[in-house]
């Protein structure tokens, strides 16, 4: 449910990497399995969003697997942080007081703020690239 809740505010198409939402969901689920209640789960989600919320989708190429690993790691780190009473708080970057406020901020950034990023990524992907197959 956490990943779906996050994705609802972002919308169906965004330059925002959907793996970030999935990583938050994984962290929330694992926190629950470790006996976490609402507050612990909420802090895990906020921590994970603070860690990894700026990742962009570039078309699900080979780098996507690494982005998924990064998102899951952010979820796990968010959980470990809250287990040790360490958390991001309102004023730390895009984090606001309360998980729902933070989710709204991330959704606004992903939906509205990344609109031009989305257009630029598409331009980069369809433009012929010199030496695209090599580094």
Put a short name on every predicted segment.
Residues 11-22, 67:
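Active-site nucleophile and cofactor-binding loops and adjacent substrate-binding regions
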Residues 9-15, 40-44:
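A beta-strand-loop signature enriched in Asp, Gly, Thr, and Trp
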Residues 2-12, 56-60:
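Glycine/charged-rich beta-loop-alpha catalytic/anionic-binding loops adjacent to active sites
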């Amino acid at each position: 449910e956490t990943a779906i809740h996050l994705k609802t505010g972002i919308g169906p198409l965004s330059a925002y990497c959907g793996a970030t939402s999935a990583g938050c969901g994984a962290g929330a689920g694992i926190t629950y399995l470790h006996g976490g209640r609402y507050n612990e789960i909420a802090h895990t989600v906020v921590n994970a969003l603070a860690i990894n919320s700026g990742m962009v989708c570039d078309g699900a190429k080979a780098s996507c697997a690494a982005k998924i690993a990064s998102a899951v790691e952010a979820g796990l780190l968010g959980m470990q942080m809250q287990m040790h009473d360490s958390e991001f708080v309102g004023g730390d970057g895009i984090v606001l007081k309360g998980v729902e406020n933070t989710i709204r901020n991330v959704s606004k950034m992903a939906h509205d703020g990344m609109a031009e990023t989305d257009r630029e990524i598409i331009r980069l992907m369809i433009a012929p690239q010199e030496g695209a197959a090599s580094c």
